[in-house]
Design a protein with these regions (language model features):
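Bacterial Sec-dependent N-terminal signal peptides
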Residues: 1-30
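Accessory carbohydrate-recognition regions in carbohydrate-active enzymes
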Residues: 30-359, 363-410
Length: 410
């Protein structure tokens, strides 16, 4: 009868809802991130990087082993290399042109130097590890253990100095790209603010940063070719280092928050990590990756196939990158500061590469971000006069053919 049918229907409906909930909970509880191998693609012509980032994050904190802008140095790292020049906070994944490598820090021991041939260090892959949201390495020359993790807008460094002595942290704003404008503002002995405006593939890129140390650091020296006024330094050549006597095994922690808009934006974004618990941030990054990777569940007894699949999925989620501050402010195509209302603003639209495969995938597994991407396209059209072709840091690079943003919108 009708009553029995309705009762059965409601029972089945409740069962299916419960099953869907349990399936979702089970998928999210699984460790998909363990299958990710960030070293896949870092050799040959893969042009990927192994460093720490979260899905679609503003920060990609990774070692730089190539600084010459070469074809196989597009990501800043190549597996064949054995020298690390430093750890910078922005990197491109899988592109055919070099850029980024912004806000580079390098820990050293002994007499400091501004020469990257001197402050760089050899390293061994035997002492290097990477997983989703985490990277670590030992710097042979200085015997410093480096561990890196990140939130969306903040890079988190942990340096362990295995020898007692004079420890330094080098800040090199001339790292990789041409420096158009650099500034360093000393706030106090644990905080500095930085602007790096550079030119490479993106012809006018702005990166503001707030750098915080967990212990007081002595501002030891600066190299500048322009203005030096008290605690403010600027120029098109700008490097600085900060020093401290350390005991054997002592750790120094550094947080670097980024903003495309202002010093105030970088300070606001620093609130993503209000503490100095490295392990907590590392775990949170891993959780974010598991949440995103759980959108596609693949089972296999072949661990290599799982590594290939989930690393490929991981690589699709390393970009586009969020390009707005926590309050929604972003730098538009007109180089003015705007506020995103009702959507999130993104950058790095390699549309010639991504319109066929990546964007259809986003449409299936991430409808919210797909809407954000399209709204970003529309704002760039309003501010710059056309939809993006190959957009980078709110700059149109005009790279490759076609007008593939139309296909993504359609």
């Amino acid at each position: 009868n009708i009553f029995t049918f309705k009762k059965f229907f409601n029972l089945m409906k409740s069962f299916l809802i419960a099953l869907a909930f349990l399936t979702t909970t089970f998928s999210q509880a699984q460790d998909f991130a363990k299958h990710v191998n960030p070293f896949i693609g870092t050799g040959g012509h893969g042009h990927t990087f192994p460093g720490a980032t979260v899905p679609y994050g503003m920060v990609q904190l990774s070692p730089d082993t190539r600084i010459d802008g070469s074809w196989d140095g597009c990501s800043g790292y190549h597996y064949d290399d054995s020298t690390i020049y430093g750890f910078s906070h922005t990197h491109l994944n899988g592109t055919g042109v070099s850029d980024y490598g912004d806000i580079m820090l390098m820990p050293t021991m002994g007499e400091p130097s501004f020469d990257n041939k001197i402050y760089s260090s050899t390293f061994s892959h035997a002492n290097e590890k990477a997983s989703a949201g985490f990277y670590s390495v030992n710097l042979d020359k200085h015997d410093i253990d480096v561990r890196l993790t990140a939130s969306t807008r903040v890079g988190f460094h942990e340096y362990t100095f295995n020898k007692a002595g004079f420890a330094n942290i080098i800040l090199d704003l001339n790292h990789r790209d041409k420096l158009l404008e650099g500034t360093v503002r000393i706030i106090d002995d644990t905080t500095i603010e930085v602007l790096r405006r550079s030119e490479a593939w993106a012809r006018n890129q702005y990166v503001y940063a707030r750098i915080e140390f967990n212990v007081p650091m002595k501002f030891t020296s600066v190299k500048s070719n322009s203005v030096t006024k008290g605690d403010f330094y600027s120029g098109t050549e700008l490097k600085a280092y900060f020093s401290k006597m350390v005991k054997k095994g002592e750790k120094i922690l550094v947080k670097v928050s980024l903003s495309p808009t202002s010093y105030e934006g970088a300070k606001l974004n620093s609130s993503e990590i209000k503490h100095w618990d490295f392990e907590k941030v590392k775990k949170e990054a891993e959780t974010l990756w598991n949440k995103e990777l759980s959108k596609i569940e693949v089972t296999s007894d072949d661990k290599d196939k799982l590594a290939i699949f989930y690393t490929a999925l991981y690589h699709t989620m390393m970009q586009p990158n969020i390009a707005q501050d926590l309050d929604g402010k972003y730098r538009g195509r007109d180089n003015q500061i705007h506020t995103a209302e009702g959507f999130d603003y993104y950058t790095v639209f390699s549309l010639w590469d991504t319109f066929r495969g990546a964007h259809p995938l986003y449409t299936l597994i991430d409808k919210k971000r797909t809407s954000d991407y399209i709204n970003t396209f529309i704002k760039q059209y309003e501010q710059g006069g056309r939809l993006p072709v190959w957009e980078l840091a709110s700059n149109e690079t005009d790279c490759m053919i076609g007008y593939h943003s139309v296909s993504v919108i359609a």
